[in-house]
Amino acid sequence: MSGAAFPSPTAEIAEMNRIHYELEYTEGISQRMRIPEQLKVAPYGSEDQELPDHELLHTAMMHVPERIIVAGHSDDMPFPRDLDLIQSTPQESTLSLKTPPRVLTLSDRPLDFLEMEQTSSVSHPSEEVRTQTKTRRERSVSENAGVHHNGPLARNDSAFALATLDSTLEGGTDDMAVVDATSLRRQIVKLNRRLQLLEEENKERAKREMVMYSITVAFWLVNSWVWFRR
């Protein structure tokens, strides 16, 4: 006979323990846990009303408390401090918020604009001169208009204003000429530096070519001498 036909004693003991545990578990659940046999949402009919109160209570009634208080039911067990704070603080129905402004102004300009202004002022200095001449013209014209309203000395003052206008125009042209001269001078300096670099590169290239040419000539001379010696 093979040993597989008879179960081992350890397996039998384990099976008995499992059955005993299941019986105890089922007995404990049946004794401690009670659920109603039926639940009804509609009002009770005449048949249900004929039953006694204790049978209704056990068969179809279920009571669920509205709240469960763990602490605070008596003076010995007060509410926790967090709950006291929550109950003491009044709840506000609405929150007060400031309305945003209708117009938003940019007080501080970003740094990119400053860099663009610096580059424009360096690359285009003639624009500043033009604005200065324009302001001078407007000032002279305003002075001339004010003098015209004064009275008997209008002609002399107008001639003086025209003379000042001519002087401002001449000054503006002189300033533009100075700016053009400075820009031309910078361009000439850049061209001179570029030419110097090109000349140095050409000299170095000529030196390299001379060295390579001398090396190739010496190589061919040595080869020819060796060939003649053979």
From Swiss-Prot:
Its main location: mitochondrion. It comes from the Eukaryota. InterPro entries: Mff-like_dom, Mff/Tango-11. The modification Phosphoserine is found at residue 142. GO terms for biological process: mitochondrial fission; positive regulation of mitochondrial fission; protein targeting to mitochondrion. One of its GO terms (molecular function) is protein homodimerization activity. It is found in: Mitochondrion outer membrane; Peroxisome. Residues 1-210 are cytoplasmic. Plays a role in mitochondrial and peroxisomal fission. Promotes the recruitment and association of the fission mediator dynamin-related protein 1 (DNM1L) to the mitochondrial surface. It comes from Danio rerio (Zebrafish). This is Mitochondrial fission factor homolog B.
